[in-house]
Amino acid sequence: RVADFYTIAIEHTSSGHPAVYDIPLYFLFGVWNLPTYLLYKFADYDYLNATPAQLWLKTMMLVFVLLAARILMRIARTMGMDADRAKWVAFYFLSAMSVVLPVFVIVQYDIVLVAVMLLGLHAYMKGNQRGFLLWFMLANTLKLFAVFVFIPLVLLKEKRLRRVAGQAVVGLAGLAFCRLLY
């Protein structure tokens, strides 16, 4: 019934908003929420109305925002900043209202994409082509916004059309797989 995922999501939505992202993000949610599911299954735990379960879900956003801050520190170090200055980069990121409001107040899942894109950008800056392509292959499946970062980065570094096409195929393969699956 994997092929019926979106149909099932529409039929059984509890919030009025059915599944709108590609399947990798929901896989991540499933892995993260496995402890609450096990409590629900074996201990009759009402996870939809339980504050600890809601806080557990919000903790996922905290983990990804801290991961993004850590990656920004690494990017700053790659750019030649000393360790103290790199910490300021993370501080400014974590204190920005464009981070605090969406991540901690609204609980938007875009921070997952941001963290994965930053991993890809860091690999790009270090010259790790394989890492860059693999991170962006994942990022492109999380949200299409990543494509608008991925394509210019490929074109910035590579000018030979065959290699551009090859890298585009690799970077967009995950997205194509998700679209073909559903």
What are these regions (language model features)?
Residues 148-173:
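Perimembrane helix-loop-helix junctions
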Residues 1-83:
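TM-lumen/periplasm interface segments of multi-pass membrane proteins
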Residues 100-101, 117-120, 130-154, 177:
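Membrane-interface alpha helices of multi-pass inner-membrane proteins
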Residues 172-182:
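Transmembrane-lumen/periplasm boundary regions of multi-pass, lipid-linked membrane glycan transferases
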Residues 104-112:
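Short acidic/glycine- and proline-prone juxtamembrane loop motifs at membrane-interface regions
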Residues 76-79, 86-100:
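Transmembrane and membrane-interface helices of multi-pass
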Residues 71, 112-131:
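Specific aromatic-rich, kink-prone transmembrane helix
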Residues 59-67, 111-119, 139-146, 168, ...:
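Membrane-embedded alpha-helical segments of multi-pass membrane proteins
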